Regions:
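Short, flexible active-site loop motifs that bind/organize anionic cofactors or intermediates
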Residues: 13, 99, 125
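Catalytic activation segment of kinase domains across protein kinase-like and atypical kinase folds
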Residues: 31, 36-62, 124-178
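Active-site activation/catalytic loop segments of kinase-like enzymes and analogous catalytic loops
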Residues: 98-101, 106, 174-179
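Conserved alphaE helix
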Residues: 104-116
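Short, glycine/acidic-rich beta->alpha junctions
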Residues: 2-5, 111-112, 129
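Conserved ATP-binding subdomain of kinase catalytic cores across diverse folds
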Residues: 1-92, 122
Length: 179
């Protein structure tokens, strides 16, 4: 996915109530890309060709590299703003790390995967290559994992690279407008 598609998916998921890391900015580097264009997936350029910047240049250019800037997950912003001086911060830990470090069991790991798959589907998306490194759990200051009311670890998507709408339609169809 292009950085613009990743941000669009993050906004779509957030609007659907699916927790994600916070998209902050997309930056186009000033220098030309050194990657040969033939190694890149060209579909992103085709799906974005009708979208342009105010000066008329395409928003996504083959000869440029882009950096996506995401918020660092260390707890809910509203909690951090209120309790920053009182409590230490939470920390994001991916599901693989949480399992490998003994914070969750293998069964809980599988439940987290199923939960993330279900959350994505509830928002009309899927990830055919979903990995445990693609979503975060929250490690609380007391070194326990934050849990839902049902006792399962809460999950927050942090990798949008392989997301797609269920059925495979592109995020930026010809007549669509990015959020």
């Amino acid at each position: 996915n292009s950085p613009f598609e990743e941000f669009a998916y993050a906004f779509q998921l957030t609007a659907a109530g699916v927790p994600t890391t916070y998209p902050r900015a997309i930056y186009m580097l000033g220098h030309r890309s050194t990657l040969p264009p033939e190694i890149l997936d060209q579909r992103r350029y085709e799906s974005h060709q009708h979208l342009s910047q105010p000066d008329g240049t395409p928003i996504l250019q083959r000869e440029r590299n882009y950096i996506s800037i995401w918020g660092y997950w260390n707890g809910l912003d509203e909690v951090l703003a209120r309790e920053d001086r009182i409590h230490p911060h939470c920390r994001g830990i991916n599901a693989d790390q949480a399992r490998d470090q003994g914070h969750i069991t293998p069964d809980e790991y599988d439940a987290c995967y199923e939960n993330m798959t279900r959350l994505l589907a509830s928002a009309g998306l899927e990830s055919p290559q979903l990995l445990g490194t693609h979503y975060l759990l929250t490690l609380l200051p007391d070194k326990t994992i934050q849990r839902n009311p049902d006792g399962l670890p809460t999950v927050r998507l942090c990798n949008f690279e392989f997301l797609r709408p269920i059925g495979g339609a592109p995020a930026f169809a010809e007549n669509s407008v990015p959020p």
